[in-house]
Structures are given as C-alpha cells and as structure tokens.
Amino acid sequence: MAIEIKAPTFPESVADGTVATWHKKPGEAVKRDELIVDIETDKVVIEVLAEADGVLAEIIKNEGDTVLSNELLGKLNEGGAAAPAAPAAAAPAAAPAAQAAAPAAAGGDDAILSPAARKLAEEAGIDPNSIAGTGKGGRVTKEDVVAAVEAKKNAPAAPAKPAAPAAEAPIFAAGDRVEKRVPMTRLRAKVAERLVEAQSAMAMLTTFNEVNMKPIMDLRSKYKDLFEKKHNGVRLGFMSFFVKAATEALKRFPGVNASIDGNDIVYHGYQDIGVAVSSDRGLVVPVLRNAEFMSLAEIEGGIANFGKKAKEGKLTIEDMTGGTFTISNGGVFGSLLSTPIVNPPQTAILGMHKIQERPMAVNGQVVILPMMYLALSYDHRLIDGKEAVSFLVAIKDLLEDPARLLLDV
C-alpha cells in the first residue's frame, strides 16, 4: 500500500518551508520512525519521519523546493522490499602470463673478454657488456673494443640542453579567485529581514554600564561543585544569574517587558526570556517560559537543553516562539562591547560581554577587578532614557550583590 509523505502542519506564524535534505533515495528501504526528509522553515528544521516500514517509492518535491503546510512530498510503499543491488562487475580476466624476457644484452651480464680487450675497454671507459662480441662463443676481442671506441668517437654529439627560459610573472589559476553563489538559508533570510525591519521600524538606542563580576565569580567558585552534585550534573554558569537579575529588574520596570501593537502598549504579566544560542545554522533564540518562577538550576538546565537541541538541529517552533525580553552573550566569542539589535515585537535586549580584568578605583585605591560591559538596546518609542538607564543599573546592582536576588531587595 502506498503511503503519502506530507509536510508537517506549520503554525500560523510559518507560511511555508523548503525541502532541505532527503535522507533516502527512491528504492531504498525505510524503517518506521526513521528520518526521511528535513523541512527548513524560517525558524527551525522539521524532521519528517516514516510512518511505517517500507521502501521510498517516489520523491515529488526535490531539495530546494518550497512546500506548504501538509503538501505532498513523496510516496512510500509500505512493506515493500528494497531494490536489488546492481550485480557486481565480472572480475577481469587474469592477466596473461608475462612475456618472455627480453634477450640479454650483446655482451651478456658477464661478457667474455680477452685480457687485452678488457684493459682497452677500461681505458676507453666503455662497458664491456655493451660490446657485441664477434669471437668464438660471443667472445669480445680486442678488435671489437677498438671498433666500439671508433663508433663512440664518430657518434654525433647530443644536442645542448636549451637554456631555461627566464622566469615569468606568476599567473593565478582560475581556481585561486573562484566565487561561489548559494541561496540564503531560510533562517538567514528571515534574520536579515527581521534585522532590517528592526532598524527601520524602531527608534533604537543603546545605553551602557559595567558590572564587577567578582561577587558572582566567587559565589560560583564556592558552590559550583556542590551545585552540580545536587542538581544531577547541571553546571552553574553566569547566564542563570543574569536571567534572575533581569526578571527582578523587569518587575520593577514593566515597560521594558512590554511591546507595541499598533497604537497600543501591551504589558506582559509574565516574563519569557529569550536566550541567544549559537548553532550550525546561525544564532537562534529559544525562550525560557515564565522565567520569573524558575530557580537557578532550572534556568541552567533549560539553557543546556536548548544548546544541545540547537547543536542537533532539534529545536522546535514552540521553543523559538514568543519572548518578552532577550539576553545575548557575545562574550563567549570574545566580544568586549557591542550594540545588540532588538528583536521585534520586543522592546529591549541585554548584551553581555567578555569578562576582562581592569584597574578600578575602589575607596580611593586602585584594584584589579574582573569587569564586564553591559549594553541595553531599547525602543525609544516606548522606553525613556531614564527608565532604560535605571533598568540597567538595577541589573548591575543585583549582580554585584547577589544576596539581593534572594532577599528580593
């Protein structure tokens, strides 16, 4: 029985997809729940699995084709046998026996010479084995050597080797300056579209501050082993502290957690924090739902799970949809300072950066401290400068005195 292979049902936010990769060819056997084809959307790659054991009968939509929700991609013959493998080519006939050895040189490997002939040959620098003997039994006589010497004298001189041509300027091979044109992936095209949209539709501005990371680093160093043991291998990183600090600051400044819808301002009564994660396809932003209620361990576990799914290409559209505020950490790549771009319809994004030791003035003394620059990009249509600066200072204060996160002060 033929089974139709269809594209999945896309959410309302996804209009169509692109056939990225067929993992099977027509005639190949397929097992139930085995990956057949990948469909790339603006946000994620969706895997289409086989509904039953069988053989891939037909591919209707080829790689690179655009497909709609539930559109037919191909057909699977349930329970069919795979096409038989092509018979192996017949083994080549055995090579014929080697031909008889070429006749020996005129004088043989050990030519027979008279003492006088051998002495003359050595004086003339002639190999006796190269002289054809005319004596009895092929013996090389003195006359044979004399004849060989005369023949060598009368032989025309070898033409002189032509002088090497002057070196010419190097010529680049065609492949040294090759260009390759490939279509954008759907994710890259969507990112490009959204970034241009954000730049043109928002009154975007960035404010900066810096945070002393020593208190967080000391706390992490003191408890990281116990934390990992207590929470089944979940590692304590810096991102969880930033998420907790952000959720607390968002409670104090709800406008930073809001969005604009036409002429309305939508204040969200929840905090869904997007965390930028690097993947082979590019930067993706999965969302921690209701982050204000999550513990440090739950935040770290969620981020680690997102990172694993991103690496394996298994992030779902649900993982990537929504978000009321975003945190991006360019510091993991070595960025010292940047101006992150707001992801609409959100109105703000926090940028973390590289921790770097710098001399700082503390109580009149110069102290070397691990410092990090913070950047908050925001939509000035909704958020005033005072509110943005105060929000960033609140995050700074919470991170420099992490006990305040526990005491809610």
Curated annotation (Swiss-Prot):
InterPro entries: 2-oxoA_DH_lipoyl-BS, 2-oxoacid_dehydrogenase, 2-oxoacid_DH_actylTfrase, Biotin_lipoyl, CAT-like_dom_sf, E3-bd_dom_sf, PSBD, Single_hybrid_motif. Its EC number is 2.3.1.61. Binds 1 lipoyl cofactor covalently. E2 component of the 2-oxoglutarate dehydrogenase (OGDH) complex which catalyzes the second step in the conversion of 2-oxoglutarate to succinyl-CoA and CO(2). SUPFAM superfamilies: CoA-dependent acyltransferases (SSF52777), Peripheral subunit-binding domain of 2-oxo acid dehydrogenase complex (SSF47005), Single hybrid motif (SSF51230). One of its GO terms (cellular component) is cytosol. The keyword Electron transport does not apply. Gene3D superfamilies: 2.40.50.100, Chloramphenicol acetyltransferase-like domain, E3-binding domain. It catalyses: N(6)-[(R)-dihydrolipoyl]-L-lysyl-[protein] + succinyl-CoA = N(6)-[(R)-S(8)-succinyldihydrolipoyl]-L-lysyl-[protein] + CoA. Residues 2-77 form the Lipoyl-binding domain. PANTHER family: DIHYDROLIPOYLLYSINE-RESIDUE SUCCINYLTRANSFERASE COMPONENT OF 2-OXOGLUTARATE DEHYDROGENASE COMPLEX, MITOCHONDRIAL, DIHYDROLIPOYLLYSINE-RESIDUE SUCCINYLTRANSFERASE COMPONENT OF 2-OXOGLUTARATE DEHYDROGENASE COMPLEX, MITOCHONDRIAL-RELATED. The active site is at 380, 384. It comes from the Bacteria. Forms a 24-polypeptide structural core with octahedral symmetry. Part of the 2-oxoglutarate dehydrogenase (OGDH) complex composed of E1 (2-oxoglutarate dehydrogenase), E2 (dihydrolipoamide succinyltransferase) and E3 (dihydrolipoamide dehydrogenase); the complex contains multiple copies of the three enzymatic components (E1, E2 and E3). Belongs to the 2-oxoacid dehydrogenase family. Pathway: Amino-acid degradation; L-lysine degradation via saccharopine pathway; glutaryl-CoA from L-lysine: step 6/6. This is Dihydrolipoyllysine-residue succinyltransferase component of 2-oxoglutarate dehydrogenase complex. It comes from Pseudomonas aeruginosa (strain ATCC 15692 / DSM 22644 / CIP 104116 / JCM 14847 / LMG 12228 / 1C / PRS 101 / PAO1). One of its GO terms (molecular function) is dihydrolipoyllysine-residue succinyltransferase activity.
